[in-house]
Amino acid sequence: MEKIASFTVNHLDLKTGIYVSRKDRLGPITLTTFDLRFTKPNTEPVMVTAGIHSIEHLGATFLRNHPKWKDNVIYFGPMGCRTRFYLILAGDLTSSDIIGLLCELADYVLGYEGEIPGYSPRDCGNYLDNNLDMAKYYMRKYKSEVLDNPTEDRLNYPQ
């Protein structure tokens, strides 16, 4: 079998960042998959599931309710490697196109207080696995490393 595109990226040179992982055509619509890389692969510890899970719930809620972007949100969720999230949006987009959206998302998570949306046994299959403080830690780190000063090496995969 042919190696899939995401396995051809040199993870040894990869930094935290906002990367276009792939673009797919669905009829007349382009779907852009973003790799929101929160930790440096194989160097930093992977994210703990409770923090990831909290970002997933808050992120999905924020993005699917965003006045400008909600109709373009296809998917937001973590990857199994626990170093990143995937964000799939309708549109032929670049990493630079979504910096503002991700800054708003970061501010939402960092300012969030109270019960996390969807955390009940009725609404979530693993509702006890959450940690808002850890989610804020990861988001603060991502904002500082990537969003506050988005350089080219954090917006485009290394060659």
Q: What do the PLM-derived regions correspond to, one by one?
A:
Residues R22-R25, R37, R64, R82-R84, ...:
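Arginine residue identity/basic-tract feature
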Residues M1-L63:
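His/Glu-rich zincin catalytic helix
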Residues Y75-D148:
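Active-site-adjacent, His/Asp/Glu-enriched structural segments that form or flank metal-binding
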Residues P41, P45-D97:
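M16/MPP (pitrilysin/insulinase) zinc-metallopeptidase core fold and M16-derived inactive scaffolds
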